[in-house]
Swiss-Prot record:
It comes from Lawsonia intracellularis (strain PHE/MN1-00). The keyword ATP-binding applies. The keyword Transcription regulation does not apply. It comes from the Bacteria. GO terms for biological process: 'de novo' IMP biosynthetic process; adenine biosynthetic process. This is Phosphoribosylformylglycinamidine cyclo-ligase. Signal peptide: none annotated.
Length: 349
């Protein structure tokens, strides 16, 4: 009877054997993400994680979920699937870092119409690499084969991250005040936002993936699939020595929509546009898309993937720590008093 049901399910478009083959493929590198606290192996009904609270007086769990968006389309176009998993981890982990949380574990959801074991293995390998960079465990996941739901050969991803922070050390921006300094940390490139506009511009220009980006040594293929940078090591090290008042992950909505999310109503962030190095891909997108820089900063990170807001007297120490970690960082602005009618982000060109 079980063989009949299995064949019927296969005829309906769901291959259980392919799912089992995937589990076999990924077990070794998923296990490499294990950290202290992991109690379960891959393949169970749930992932088990034991919290170590010896250094946390009032533990607060912080969670986030996200995807990779239409950046996946370039993975399909270029048939390269081993880096978008890093993007998936980065989008979730970077969000919980904003509140001072240390990532603990990650879960993924992979959905496709017909499971391609090799392709899915590459994706989950990337997720494992992202988890290792973030120093969190890949505790489990779901692979959903959904016949007819997706274009053949394509898939979608979702990620879920949980971290921990002591309640007394939550970073929420409430202490930000006039005179504080804004530091920008370099992005690795476009990261994972704005790709619908990127695709539109790319298609209009009919460029080839192996063309060199003007002003760069990199090809479009290399830059378009360069993984989102994971900031956990940097932030977890900085927090030990620096009083950080607020942090911002520059994602969809760019500077204008993300920075206000951590600012008190009485202040504005004055950003000096000329204060950091803008990677060549953004100049190319701005020119070919006939976009103003205001529009660019509303959509893209334009070279700044993460923002720190710190007291003025901590700036030298913070910049020295960042330099010792070989992190590209710039003082990009300051916190000022909000006047009537002011937007909360002012870009000074």
């Amino acid at each position: 009877m079980s063989l009949i049901r299995s064949q019927a399910y296969t005829n309906a478009g769901v291959n259980i054997n392919a799912g089992n083959a995937l589990i076999s493929n990924i077990k070794s590198f998923v296990s490499e993400t294990n950290i202290q606290g992991v109690l379960s192996d891959l393949g169970g009904f749930g992932g088990l994680f034991k919290l170590n609270l010896t250094q946390v007086d009032n533990p607060v769990l912080v969670s986030s979920t996200d995807g990779v968006g239409t950046k996946l389309k370039f993975a399909f176009d270029f048939n390269k699937h081993d880096t978008v998993g890093i993007d998936l981890v980065a989008m979730c982990v970077n969000d919980i870092l904003v509140q001072g949380a240390r990532p603990l574990f990650f879960l993924d959801y992979f959905a496709t119409s017909k499971l391609d074991v090799d392709k899915a293995t590459q994706v989950i390998y990337g997720i494992s690499e992202g988890c290792k960079q973030a120093r969190c465990a890949l505790l489990g996941g779901e692979t959903a084969e959904l016949p007819g739901m997706y274009t053949e050969g394509e898939y979608d991803l979702a990620g879920f991250c949980v971290g921990i922070v002591d309640q007394s050390k939550i970073i929420d921006g409430s202490s930000i005040k006039v005179g504080d300094t804004i530091i920008g940390l370099a992005s690795s490139g476009i990261h994972s936002n704005g790709y619908s506009l990127v695709r539109q511009i790319i298609n209009q220009c009919a460029i080839e993936p192996d063309n060199i980006i003007p002003g760069s040594r990199d090809t479009f293929k290399q830059v378009l699939l360069k993984p989102t940078f994971i900031y956990s090591d940097i932030i977890c090290n900085l927090i030990k020595d620096i009083s950080i008042k607020g942090m911002v992950h520059i994602t969809g909505g760019g500077f204008y929509d993300n920075i206000p999310r951590v600012l008190p109503q009485s202040v504005v962030a004055n950003i000096q546009f000329s204060s950091w190095d803008i990677p060549p891909i953004f100049y190319w997108l701005q020119e070919q898309g006939s976009l103003s820089w205001s529009e660019m900063l509303q959509v893209f990170n334009c070279g700044i993937g993460y923002v720190l807001i710190i007291p003025n007297d901590s700036v030298t120490r913070a910049m020295n720590i960042l330099k010792s970690m070989e992190v590209s960082a710039w003082i990009i602005g300051s916190i000022e008093k909000q006047n009537v009618g002011d937007e909360q982000v002012i870009i000074t060109y």
